[in-house]
């Protein structure tokens, strides 16, 4: 017989050995991660992924690094006068310039200077700076360009298809040189575009080039080795067997000395980017990925725009057959291209037009365009879309509408698909030294040239993401 004392001792030991098995189990509390969506979204700002997929509030997307949302808002500022197919530039003095057709002396193209960069109130000024002793009065295609390396302002006028003249200023328009003649007798001159590249020329720090729609099955181009004072012969701006048609989007020069331009492919199908590495002596064709997107069937169907960032990466933008805006990039000077990305916001746009593209530092890019909202009323608004992490597999896109809901830039039927009021044939876009995007276009209902921009948003310059200095809201108050 087992003694009672031994039984009690055994039970006591069993109790101690099993007490931990039936006690309360400590559960580690899950600490919620802070959301990147920690700010309010303005009514006319949209955060989205490619193909108009809404991204707002999506914490499962693992947004990080440069691919994160930043507060953004868009607005515009009037130049106080009309414009037609406005081109623009920015000088090292932080002055914005826009062409203004017919508003200069003797009916010339005005070169309008605005001190908008860095404003804290709407007390800004815009005034014509083109006032030479003998102004060039007749201009069928007004065009200005600012050399991003030297700040030389180039005024480039076409005269009734018969010839072109070039004038330039090295002091923000205080004085003008020229005109020089930029014309060859063997071709008509139409739809010109001009740019400089960071290639040392014989008599000037940069090489200049222009291209035209002339008497050839593709654009003709000419280069200058002395900053635009004299010009070489107009030669093929594409492979000599190319049949792309002569209408070209804006020419652009690169940090590596290359020039690029975009238009229809040499077969007449799709869009291509054309590149010269030797100031126009020879050109190569680099087809864009338009097999799925198709190409626009509109007045400005040649508008396959191209731009380069500070590292020489190439960005292209075009309208597809569905009239939506598409983007592709190349990191090897156009040899290969990323898949096409549809960049419109998730707001049911029925179509877009007048595309322009600009790039800041490596991996940043912004797009300007006009768009029609679906509905019974024909309403055209202006938009800017950007990404700060362009080479991400799923880049976050941010789009702002520049005009208010009750302030459309036009209400004409199919405005974005045709030559429409002051929008003309094309628009223009640049990034200033601080990383703010500026988009030159026309507010057709008010008949004013306007600069569209982000009054709130991140900089497209610098290694890290920083916010721009906030600017006052412009809009109708500036018309």
Q: What is each stretch, according to the model?
A:
Residues 30-479:
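Extracellular, repeat-based ectodomains that mediate carbohydrate processing or recognition
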């Amino acid at each position: 017989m087992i003694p009672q004392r031994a039984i009690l001792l055994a039970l006591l030991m069993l109790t101690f050995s099993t007490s931990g098995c039936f006690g309360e189990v400590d559960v580690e509390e899950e600490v919620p991660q802070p959301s990147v969506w920690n700010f309010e979204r303005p009514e006319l700002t949209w955060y989205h992924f490619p193909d108009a997929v809404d991204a707002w509030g999506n914490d499962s997307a693992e947004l990080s690094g440069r691919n994160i949302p930043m507060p953004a808002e868009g607005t515009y500022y009037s130049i106080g006068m009309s414009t037609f197919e406005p081109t623009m530039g920015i000088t090292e003095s932080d002055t914005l310039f826009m062409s203004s057709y017919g508003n200069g002396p003797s009916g010339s193209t005005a070169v309008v200077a605005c001190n908008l960069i860095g404003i804290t109130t709407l007390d800004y000024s815009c005034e014509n700076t083109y006032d030479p002793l003998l102004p060039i009065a007749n201009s069928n295609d007004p065009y200005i360009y600012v050399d991003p390396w030297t700040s030389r302002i180039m005024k480039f006028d076409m005269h009734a298809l018969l010839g072109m003249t070039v004038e330039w200023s090295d002091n923000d328009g205080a004085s003008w040189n020229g005109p020089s003649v930029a014309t060859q007798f063997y071709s008509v001159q139409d739809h010109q575009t001009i740019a400089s590249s960071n290639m040392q020329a014989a008599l000037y720090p940069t090489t200049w080039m222009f291209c035209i729609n002339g008497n050839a099955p593709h654009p003709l181009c000419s280069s200058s080795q002395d900053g635009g004072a004299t010009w070489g012969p107009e030669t093929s701006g594409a492979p000599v067997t190319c049949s792309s048609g002569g209408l070209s989007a804006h020419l652009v020069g690169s940090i590596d000395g290359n020039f690029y331009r975009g238009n229809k492919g040499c077969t007449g199908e799709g869009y291509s980017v054309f590149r010269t590495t030797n100031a126009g002596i020879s050109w190569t064709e680099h087809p864009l990925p338009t097999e799925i997107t198709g190409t626009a069937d509109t007045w400005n169907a040649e508008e396959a725009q191209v731009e380069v960032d500070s590292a020489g990466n190439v960005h292209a933008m075009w309208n597809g057959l569905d009239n939506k805006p598409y983007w592709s990039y190349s990191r090897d000077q156009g040899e290969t291209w990323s898949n096409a990305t549809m960049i419109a916001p998730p707001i049911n746009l029925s179509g877009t037009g007048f595309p322009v593209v600009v790039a800041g530092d490596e991996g940043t890019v912004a797009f300007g365009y006009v768009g029609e909202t679906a509905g019974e009323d024909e309403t055209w608004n202006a938009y800017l879309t950007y990404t700060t992490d362009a080479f991400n597999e799923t880049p976050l896109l941010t789009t702002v509408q520049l005009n208010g809901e009750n302030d459309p830039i036009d209400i004409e039927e199919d405005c974005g698909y045709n030559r429409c009021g002051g929008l003309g044939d094309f628009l223009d876009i640049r990034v200033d030294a601080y990383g703010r995007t500026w988009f030159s276009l026309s507010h057709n209902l008010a008949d004013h040239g306007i600069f569209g921009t982000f009054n709130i948003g991140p900089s497209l310059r610098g290694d890290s993401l920083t916010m721009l200095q906030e600017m006052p809201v412009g809009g109708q108050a500036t018309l």
